[in-house]
Amino acid sequence: TAAAERLVTSDKVNAIMGADCSGVTGAILQNVARPNGIVMISPSATSPALSTAEDDGLFFRTSPSDARQGVVMTNIIMDRGFKTVALTYTNNDYGKGLADSFAAAFEAAGGTVTINAAHDEDKADYSAEVGALASAGGDLLVVAGYESGGGKQIIQASLDTGAFDTFVLPDGMVGQAIVDAIGPDLNGSFGQYPGSENKGADVFGGLASAAGFEGSSAFAGESYDAAALIMLAMQAGGSSASADVMQHVMNVANAPGVQIMPGQLGQALVLLEAGYDIDYVGATAVELIGPGESAGNYREIEIQNAKVETVGYR
């Protein structure tokens, strides 16, 4: 929160694109954004608790709540014929929220969660955690963690000991970096992260490629859209003050209006200045609902030939 406080009090920013993880986002919302009346749009904070957090109308997110991800993950696992899983989650707001959502959805669908256990980040050794997961058993191990942290180490230890050979990877675990680190032993594992099949995603992918980065990586499109919504809401209200911006985020994000794709932000600014309504589609088919969060589409992935491959959309 210190960095966010500095941005607001010293740098005098009018809005924050962020934060990234749910715990940090919640802390900044309550300790910095609300006391100072600053709008936040997070691209990647997915905890269900943020849907009902006291926010004074200041908080939005372009990623869907993990309440939906738990259902999507259940459907993906069930559709592949698996009925029994072990579950480990990173011991924070993100991990606990996703684990609770998934366990409830999976068991309601007739599945069995043999163990639902937290793990801490940045430990030198995860043999005790892997031992407990192995003892509980299951067709698969669901790892609700981070690809650069304890989640990766638990997968590696599970492979080394033969505890599990197939893993379910939620959004925080999806990335080419973990595949490169673990190698072909991760082939056949699968999962999901926010993403949609739409014209905007294709356009954004082309723009990203031209700029030298991978546009389909987790939360890339959501980040672009979060920043775009802040700018467009400022233009719609004719003001950069957060008190005005918060009133226009939902309007520019949703129909009715002229649809705006990635790469058309300049056109959108002109339209808004001329008094037209816009419907920002963006990279992720933005549609904000209820408490100002994405309705939620997911990209289903599988690790094939040591690559993260898209195999469908949910």
Residues covered by each model-derived region:
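Extracytosolic ligand-binding ectodomains
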Residues: 1-314
